Amino acid sequence: MRRPKSSHVRMEPVAPRSHNTMPMLDQFRSNHPETSKIEGVSSLDTALKVFWNNQREQLGNFAGQTHLPLSRVRKILKSDPEVKKISCDVPALFSKACEYFILEVTLRAWMHTQSCTRETIRRCDIFQAVKNSGTYDFLIDRVPFGPHCVTHQGVQPPAEMILPDMNVPIDMDQIEEENMMEERSVGFDLNCDLQ
């Protein structure tokens, strides 16, 4: 039997295709188009209410499928030396709670991104989402924030300017004399003949 050339072998993906966004966020966006152009804090509250109502509806249809790997969640839970045994329901429950956390922080960061008229979530958007939330403010020390986050809106950080003291009296005659001395000290004359 002859084997096909390696260039003709079609490789099947090991894992299912990954998405740019989580499917629940896509459903939220498609079910509630009025939240796509939201501005201000009150609209963030509206978006969060719609989001959590949608999550409650989906929770009724929850069949145990999670987007985070349960084996990894179980390993993280077992990494604590005080944990001896883990019930079989705990990884699924913890995974679902992590999904809700990720979705809400992402929604808050997305709202901040849209308020800055951008279409890409950046680290500073996540920082602002955590900072502006009373629930997640304990994470402020864990989310990195640097000076690069200030320039994303086109606003440069203030530069240090050293200005002369404006209250000192200036003698204009002395400045004119210094300028005249500099002009005389030039070492050549343009009108002289070079031979």
From Swiss-Prot:
Residues 1-24 are annotated as: Disordered. Gene3D superfamilies: Histone, subunit A (1.10.20.10). Pfam families: CBFD_NFYB_HMF (PF00808). GO terms for molecular function: DNA binding; DNA-binding transcription factor activity; protein heterodimerization activity. Keywords: Activator, DNA-binding, Nucleus, Transcription, Transcription regulation. It is found in: Nucleus. GO terms for cellular component: nucleus. Its main location: nucleus. Heterotrimeric transcription factor composed of three components, NF-YA, NF-YB and NF-YC. NF-YB and NF-YC must interact and dimerize for NF-YA association and DNA binding. PANTHER family: HISTONE-LIKE TRANSCRIPTION FACTOR CCAAT-RELATED, NUCLEAR TRANSCRIPTION FACTOR Y SUBUNIT C-10. Stimulates the transcription of various genes by recognizing and binding to a CCAAT motif in promoters. Belongs to the NFYC/HAP5 subunit family. This is Nuclear transcription factor Y subunit C-10. The gene is NFYC10.
